[in-house]
């Protein structure tokens, strides 16, 4: 039995590099409409090759902008079937002592790595429930 993903859609955070870029490519190659979210743009050739991908430059720590961007995608696609959170940063040495971490840096890392996932869940889960389908990674 061959799986069909026709008509499915996905949102990928941290989508312009590493794991996020590879996942976006794989999903696009399986006919899934992909909304790529990141602060940096993917290579222009990537978007030309992967016609099922669209990119939006966005700060994942800005709840209102995320909600607006996702709502536009949802209205067009009529569903959000998959959410893949690959956003993550480490802006200090992994071996640094907790007493030496700058509080402002730690707050921003926490917002990006954890708070953004909660924001996305809060925005997307109700849409998945409405459509009685969804998967988050």
Task: Report residues per predicted region.
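Active-site loop of short-chain dehydrogenase/reductase
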Residues: 8, 79-81, 128-137
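Conserved glycine-rich cofactor-binding loop
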Residues: 16-17
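Conserved glycine-rich Rossmann-like NAD(P)H-binding loop of the short-chain dehydrogenase/reductase
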Residues: 30-45
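The beta1-alpha1 cofactor-binding region of Rossmann-like NAD(H)/NADP(H)-dependent oxidoreductases
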Residues: 57-68, 103
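Conserved NAD(P)H cofactor-binding loop of Rossmann-fold oxidoreductase domains
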Residues: 87-94
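Substrate-binding pocket helix/loop in short-chain dehydrogenase/reductase
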Residues: 94-98, 102-107
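A short, exposed helix-loop element centered on a Lys and neighboring polar residues
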Residues: 121-122
